[in-house]
Design a protein with these regions (language model features):
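N-terminal export leaders
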Residues: 3-7
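A structural "domain/chain start" motif
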Residues: 16-86, 198-205
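Surface-exposed short loop/turn segments
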Residues: 17-31, 35-40, 101-151
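Soluble periplasmic/extracytoplasmic beta-strand elements of cell-envelope proteins
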Residues: 48-53, 66, 119-124, 139-145, ...
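Extracytoplasmic/secreted envelope proteins and their assembly/folding machinery
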Residues: 87, 91, 95, 101, ...
């Protein structure tokens, strides 16, 4: 074998290496779609609600499930993810929840041609699970606006939190289910705030 061939042999062998750069661990993806337990029909003349895009605060744009550590930090799961950005999933779930609440004749998204008088602007502020506390947590903050002609005014500001129990040693599917339940708890709290806020607005007219 020539000296040139000997020099090229290690390069050829390296090119045949097929070992992966990282372990071949399948990614698990989870839904985030808490549903209202019952569905109510809105009364005649109920308002139309527009929900603007729900955004996540910094740290909640990751797809990976978020675990709160005992030291106050957070860890993002590398192989366990939401199906889509959690704020997008929360927005779709919130629209369905509020439509089922019976408070509004319709709950629409930006781009809808439906005439609306109420606008919801919200952020997803919390979505994690805390093994040390045996709970999952979710939170939303924002404002409910009344829009008429070219003016608008704030009917309600809110910062709601939801919690759900989490068993010790829970795996990723159980943690995702607990976070979904916590988000549903936050939605229920928001619905109660809407009932009070809309009643106050009607009384003030």
């Amino acid at each position: 074998m020539s000296r040139r061939a000997l020099l090229l042999l290690p390069l050829a062998l390296a090119g045949c290496t097929v070992l992966p750069d990282r372990p071949n661990i399948p990614v698990r993806r989870f839904t985030l779609n808490p549903e209202r337990p019952t569905r109510r029909t809105a009364p005649r003349g109920a308002a139309v609600l527009l929900i603007r895009r729900v955004r996540g605060v910094p740290g909640l744009q990751e797809l990976g499930l978020r675990r709160a550590e005992a030291d106050g930090g957070f860890a993002i799961a590398p192989w366990d993810e939401w199906l889509a950005p959690p704020s997008d999933l929360a927005e779709a779930a919130l629209r369905s929840w509020l439509q089922a609440s019976g408070l509004f004749s319709a709950v629409v998204a930006p781009g809808s041609r439906a005439e609306h008088t109420l606008v919801l602007e919200a952020q997803l502020t919390v979505l994690d699970y805390a093994p040390a506390a045996n709970e999952a947590r979710a939170g939303l903050a924002g404002v409910l606006l009344l829009e008429r002609s070219l003016s608008s005014r704030v009917l309600l500001t809110f910062d709601v939190r939801g919690r759900a129990p989490l068993a010790a040693g829970a795996d990723a599917p159980a943690a995702a289910a607990a976070m979904q339940a916590a988000l549903g708890d936050a939605f229920a709290e928001l619905e109660r705030a809407f009932v009070a806020g809309l009643a106050g607005a009607s009384a003030a007219r």
